[in-house]
Amino acid sequence: MDISKLMQQAKDMQGKMAAIQEDLAKKIITGSAGGGMVEVQVNGQGEILAIKIEDALINTDEKEMLQDLVTAATNDGLRRAKDLSKQEMGQLTGGMNLPDLTNFLS
């Protein structure tokens, strides 16, 4: 086994991962709740970019429901971003589930 070849492969994979992470940061995923009355936009790295709330929900009598919908939409968006990230990283790893790979190569 050639150590220098393995090191080069690891370096190449690290570069590819960095490119994927950069690409994920540019992708916008929308999570929604309440039939689209609340939408949360996140990027592929799980950062919240925007929250949109329909005017009909902005009523102090509905505060608790609004909070629940914002939470649900946020979780939906973050789940979708995580799924996208797994899909993109899966292309790099040939579909192998390597949960520690991101930490190792970053």
From Swiss-Prot:
- The keyword DNA-binding belongs to this UniProt entry's keyword annotation: yes
Coiled coil regions in record: none
Keywords for this protein:
Cytoplasm, DNA-binding
What are the recorded GO MF terms, alphabetically?
Answer: DNA binding
User: Which pairs of positions does the record mark as disulfide bonds?
Assistant: none
The UniProt entry's GO CC annotations, sorted and at most eight, read: bacterial nucleoid; cytosol
- List where the protein spans the membrane: none
Q: What is its main location?
A: cytoplasm
| Stored InterPro entries | YbaB-like_sf, YbaB/EbfC
The UniProt similarity line reads: Belongs to the YbaB/EbfC family.
Give the record's subunit note.
Homodimer.
Explain the purpose of this protein: Binds to DNA and alters its conformation. May be involved in regulation of gene expression, nucleoid organization and DNA protection.
Checking PANTHER family in the record gives: NUCLEOID-ASSOCIATED PROTEIN YBAB
Q: Which HAMAP family match?
A: DNA_YbaB_EbfC
Q: What is this protein called?
A: Nucleoid-associated protein DP1429
Q: Origin organism of this chain?
A: Desulfotalea psychrophila (strain LSv54 / DSM 12343)
